[in-house]
UniProtKB/Swiss-Prot annotation:
This is Death domain-associated protein 6. The modification N6-acetyllysine is found at K503. Residues 617-731 are annotated as: Interaction with SPOP. The gene is Daxx. Residues 1-158 are annotated as: Necessary for interaction with USP7 and ATRX. Residues 432-482 have a biased composition (Acidic residues). Residues 345-560 are annotated as: Necessary for interaction with USP7. Sumoylated with SUMO1 on multiple lysine residues. Repressor activity is down-regulated upon Ser-661 phosphorylation. Upon neuronal activation dephosphorylated by calcineurin in a Ca2+ dependent manner at Ser-661; dephosphorylation positively affects histone H3.3 loading and transcriptional activation. GO terms for molecular function: enzyme binding; histone binding; JUN kinase binding; kinesin binding; molecular condensate scaffold activity; nuclear androgen receptor binding; p53 binding; protein homodimerization activity. Transcription corepressor known to repress transcriptional potential of several sumoylated transcription factors. Down-regulates basal and activated transcription. Its transcription repressor activity is modulated by recruiting it to subnuclear compartments like the nucleolus or PML/POD/ND10 nuclear bodies through interactions with MCSR1 and PML, respectively. Seems to regulate transcription in PML/POD/ND10 nuclear bodies together with PML and may influence TNFRSF6-dependent apoptosis thereby. Inhibits transcriptional activation of PAX3 and ETS1 through direct protein-protein interactions.
Amino acid sequence: MATDDSIIVLDDDDEDEAAAQPGPSNPASNPVSPGPEASGPSESHGDGGSSNSGSRKCYKLENEKLFEEFLELCKMQTSDHPEVVPFLHKLQQRAQSAFLASAEFRNILSRVLSRSRNRPAKLYVYINELCTVLKAHSIKKKLNLAPAASAESSGDNPPTDPPSDLTNTETTASEASRTRGSRRQIQRLEQLLALYVAEIQRLQEKELDLSELDDPDSSYLQEARLKRKLIRLFGRLCDLKDCSSLTGKVIEQRIPYRGTRYPEVNRRIERLINKPGPDTFPDYGDVLRAVEKAATRHSLGLPRQQLQLLAQDAFRDVGVRLQERRHLDLIYNFGCHLTDDYRPGVDPALTDPTLARRLRENRTLAMSRLDEVISKYAMMQDKSEEGERQKRRARLLATSQSSDLPKASSDSGEGPSGVASQEDPTTPKAETEDEEDDEESDDEEEEEEEEEEEATEDEDEDLEQLQEDQDDEEEEEGDNEDDKSPASPSPIFRRKEFSNPQKGSGPQEEQQERGLTGTPASPLEASPGLPSTDAESSGEQLQERLLAGESPVSQLSELDMEALPEETIPSPEERGISSSRRKSDSSLPTILENGAAMVTSTSFNGRVSSHPCRDASPPSKRFRKEKKQLGPGPLGNSYVKKQTMAQQDSGWKISVLSTPSSPLASVGPVADSSTRVDSPSHELVTSSLCNPSPSLILQTPQSQSPRPCIYKTSVATQCDPEEIIVLSDSD
């Protein structure tokens, strides 16, 4: 009987056994007193009862013998794990006595024992199966309280024993009638199960072609439908037999989870992954909702970010463990009755090279198709994410533009002088771009500042190098022109007339060509776009006055007055005051480090420095660096006049603002003595920014905050070999 591997179908003895099954108190008395004294009550029931009890005793003795043989086999095979045998003993003691003396337990033991002897490598699988069966038929703790309570009551009140015996016999009779009534259903379900198993085996033996995969009635789909029906029949049969439907598969094992430090969250996640029903794989959203519910119900007080981190860690851990369980279930249950006799050393692909090559080709094809499917949906996901990102950027830009509209309307309003302030068309774009960059991230702003500092340092180095070269050229020219009088008005500029005066002349185009950028911030600054005809006329007037030999200072002052708006043109009284100040300033001796007089702001190739004084903004970073390098000296309180000139293709545009001595006046860099020329103004050569006069500062409205402005000069566009300034040495 022990070596029998087939499933034994229950015979009519089980019906008699179930019919003659005693109450809960009788099975406990039978094992304790198996002698002839206990056989008295059974003899009173007749010959049928004695035969049933005899069959039960035979089953029990046989089951005990089979269980001992299985334990001996486990001792030999599981010497590395000695705790296996005591664990099996404990489970047997906790099992129900009726189940231990049943034919079902005998069939399970015989099957497990025979398979363990044939396949010792899978011994632990069969041990697990036996443990699952014993746990399913173990005595529950709640059921153990009833016999104890009845025993106490029987001890205290002996006359109540006969009614309890009557109730036990009544329940036994009802159970026997119910069992006899469902006997026919059980037999019918068993026949259906056998029929389904035979049909499934027949379908598994059929060859499946690739063309049949799309057929809705293919053998593979028929087999899947029959297996689902078989599972439902098995569950119904277990309900009728009042036994557990667990089969010991890995997929049925409960997964304990202790991944977080919060027991409430652990219990919620464990309940989620061990939910009864189909093996569903929870996604990140399910885990996050479970964590949030646990935190809300138990008032954990965790922030949103920490809940997300907990959910992410739990999702990774749970996903790995569920994948491992599915993989093990696939390994244990893969195949069919055709692969039951498979051994690792008898693979036909090891001896047949054609089959091995075909299997490798099929595997390569399967992996390539799998990669195509994965890449397809990965690209679809990337496209959807990119589309969402672009929509988000569009919304942010729309909101930023809507917030910039009131600012632009306030900036375009009328100033205190009654004239609408106009802005340079290049500045709003730069300001909006800077604001967007500031709103996006501060790192980009720091990188831009570093790049600007590097660019200004490179420009300073280029300017210094060009200044040294020009100084050498000026010294050579000064040696050749010593015979000329320093006071005689010599021609200063020799300029080539442009053949095409109609070439686009605008301040914006000129600044783009020469690399100049400015940010006006007050209504006192010049309008951004003078007409080309005005620029040409101003250039012609400048050329005529230069040829007539007029003083450059007067020329520059008159052109400056013409360029300024009407409200900013000084009255005759103010002109007299400014002229008196200019005379007093010119009468004061200004001392340089080498004792030379100050000269005009003339560029290296004969042009006037193109750094327009725009507003009362604080000095730029470059100017602060120059001021630090300058340090305290004799020029700290000197009077410096900045002259600015911007060359256009059709003429010259010059603006001059005088800066008298004031606490607000900034100190320009010290010019080298080699840059001195014979000029009527006798002022310092400088190319730094200038501050406006106090009168202009007072006219600036207090409500308008000064804006920083950066002026960049491209040295490469200034050095024109055809425009030469003839310099003379004043010494």
